[in-house]
From Swiss-Prot:
GO terms for molecular function: DNA binding. SUPFAM superfamilies: Replication terminator protein (Tus). It is found in: Cytoplasm. The gene is tus. The keyword Calcium does not apply. GO terms for cellular component: cytoplasm. It comes from Salmonella arizonae (strain ATCC BAA-731 / CDC346-86 / RSK2980). Keywords: Cytoplasm, DNA replication, DNA-binding. It comes from the Bacteria. The keyword tRNA-binding does not apply. One of its GO terms (biological process) is DNA replication termination. Trans-acting protein required for termination of DNA replication. Binds to DNA replication terminator sequences (terA to terF) to prevent the passage of replication forks. The termination efficiency will be affected by the affinity of this protein for the terminator sequence. InterPro entries: DNA_replication_term_site-bd (IPR008865), Tus_dom1 (IPR036381), Tus_sf (IPR036384). This is DNA replication terminus site-binding protein. Belongs to the Tus family.
Length: 309
C-alpha cells in the first residue's frame, strides 16, 4: 500500500473516531444517569513529565459534574484542548465510572457503539505502529505531520463498558514490564547498537561506543546459561475491581478513563455500590501478597537489565 493510501486511511479512520465519540456522548446524555463518580488527578507539567510519581492527590467529582468531565475526557484528543503548561507526553487520566439506566434495546445499542469505537481505535493504532513500518522514534513526527497536536495515547485508548456490576472499587497498581533474555540475546542487541554510528546524549559518539563496549564485555563475561531479566518500572496506574454478584467473580480493569456501566432494569439490576479512590503514596503501599523475589543484580542500569545471583 502506498504512503498516500495509508495517510488517507489514517485520516479517515480518525475522523470516524471523532464522529462516533460525539454520537456516543450525545447518546449517553439521553439516558438516565443513576450515579457517577470520577477522580481528577493533578496535571503533569512539561518539566515533570519524566519524574517518578511518589504521591498523587485525588479530587473526587460526583453526579452531573462527574458526567460532564467524563464525556469531555472521552473526546480529549488534541493538546490544543488542554493547558499549554501540561505535558503532551504524560497520559491524561480520569479514573471513575458513569452508571446509566438501560433496557434490553438501549443496552445493545450502546454496546454496539462502544464496540465500533474500540475497533476504530485499534485499527488506528495498527496503522501507526505496524502499517507505517516506522520505528517508534519516528512515529511521533509522522503522525503529527498529518494530525498536528494529536495525543496518540488518547486516540489509541479504548473505552471500557461493563454490564450490571454489583460493586466497583478503585485502587492503584504498581507494575513492571518484565522480559526474560538469554546472554546471547543481550549480546546480539548490544552488537547491533555497537554497529550503529549514532550517539546518545549527553555522550559523544566516542563516549557512547566506549560505554557499549564495556556493557558488551560485562555480559560476555557471564556464563552462557546466565538468567537475565529486563524489569522496567511502569508509572503507577489507577485500576477498578468489579464484582459481579450473579457470576460470583471479580474482574480487574485498568482505569485511565471512566468506565461506562450499564444497569439493565429490565433484568432487575440495581445501582452498584461504588467506592472511592485514595490518594497514592509510594511510601505507604500495602501488598495483599508479595511472593519472595529471586535475588537479582542490576548489571546494565539504562536497560533495567538484571542478572540472577
Amino acid at each position: 500500500m502506498s504512503c498516500y493510501d495509508l495517510v488517507e486511511r489514517l485520516n479517515g479512520t480518525f475522523r470516524q473516531i471523532e464522529q462516533h465519540l460525539a454520537a456516543l456522548t450525545d447518546n449517553l446524555q439521553q439516558h438516565s444517569l443513576l450515579i457517577a463518580r470520577v477522580f481528577s488527578l493533578p496535571q503533569v507539567t512539561k518539566e515533570a513529565e519524566h519524574a517518578p510519581l511518589d504521591t498523587i492527590e485525588v479530587t473526587q467529582h460526583l453526579g452531573k459534574e462527574a458526567e460532564t468531565l467524563a464525556l469531555r475526557h472521552y473526546r480529549h484528543l488534541f493538546i490544543q484542548q488542554q493547558s499549554e503548561n501540561r505535558s503532551s507526553k504524560a497520559a491524561v487520566r480520569l479514573p471513575g465510572v458513569l452508571c446509566y439506566q438501560v433496557d434490553n434495546a438501549t443496552q445493545a445499542d450502546l454496546e454496539n457503539q462502544v464496540q465500533r469505537i474500540n475497533q476504530l481505535k485499534t485499527t488506528f493504532g495498527q496503522m501507526v505502529t505496524v502499517e507505517s513500518g516506522l520505528p517508534s522514534a519516528a512515529r511521533f513526527e509522522w503522525v503529527h505531520r498529518y494530525l498536528p497536536g494529536l495525543i496518540t495515547l488518547n486516540a489509541y485508548r479504548t473505552l471500557t463498558l461493563i454490564n450490571n456490576p454489583a460493586t466497583i472499587r478503585f485502587g492503584w497498581a504498581n507494575k513492571h514490564i518484565i522480559k526474560n533474555l538469554s546472554r546471547d540475546e543481550v549480546l546480539s542487541q548490544l552488537k547491533k547498537s555497537l554497529s550503529s554510528t549514532r550517539s546518545v546524549p549527553p555522550w559523544t559518539r566516542e563516549q557512547w561506543q566506549f560505554k557499549l563496549e564495556r556493557e558488551y564485555q560485562d555480559i560476555a563475561a557471564l556464563p552462557q546459561q546466565a538468567r537475565l531479566k529486563i524489569k522496567r518500572p511502569v508509572k503507577v496506574q489507577p485500576i477498578a475491581r468489579i464484582w459481579y454478584k450473579g457470576q460470583q467473580k471479580q474482574v480487574q480493569h485498568a482505569c485511565p478513563t471512566p468506565i461506562i456501566a450499564l444497569i439493565n432494569t429490565d433484568n432487575g439490576a440495581g445501582v452498584p455500590d461504588i467506592g472511592g479512590l485514595e490518594n497514592y503514596d509510594a511510601d505507604n503501599i500495602q501488598h495483599r501478597f508479595k511472593p519472595q523475589a529471586q535475588p537479582m543484580r542490576l548489571i546494565i542500569p539504562r536497560l533495567h537489565l538484571y542478572v540472577a545471583d
